[in-house]
């Protein structure tokens, strides 16, 4: 597994959404398994809004923590409602595809972070 990141632009901010073991653990705690969460967020049938919003929140908050550590900043984590607003503006289906792609890229790569 390798840390993977996408940029999410919302209004005047750019968020880095990460998928790594920390996010994987949070998703497993909330939804049981990564597979169960993935089934809820896959495009096709109606995606589970709570699953997508929660996953996006975990990923953005991990990015905020990493940026805070790397840059000595003190940006506050986003809330569930803020993640929902971001998702609403960006589009549910498009964002679901992006975050599912992020997860697939991370877990399909056996390389370590360098």
Q: Where are each of the predicted segments found?
A:
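Short, hydrophobic/amphipathic alpha-helical patches that form generic packing surfaces
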Residues: 51-62
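Short strand-coil-strand connectors
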Residues: 11-13
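Short linear motifs in exposed loops
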Residues: 18-19
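Charged interaction scaffolds used for protein-protein
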Residues: 1-9, 29-45, 68-114
């Amino acid at each position: 597994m390798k840390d993977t990141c996408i940029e999410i632009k919302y209004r005047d901010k750019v968020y880095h959404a990460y998928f790594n073991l920390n996010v994987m653990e949070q998703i497993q705690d909330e939804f049981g398994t990564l597979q169960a969460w993935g089934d809820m967020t896959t495009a096709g049938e109606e995606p589970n809004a709570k699953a997508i919003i929660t996953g996006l929140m975990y990923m953005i908050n991990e990015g905020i923590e990493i940026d805070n550590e790397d840059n000595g900043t003190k940006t506050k984590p986003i809330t569930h409602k803020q993640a929902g607003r971001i998702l609403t503006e960006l589009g549910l289906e498009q964002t679901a595809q992006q975050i599912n792609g992020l997860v697939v890229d991370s877990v399909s790569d056996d390389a370590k972070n360098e």
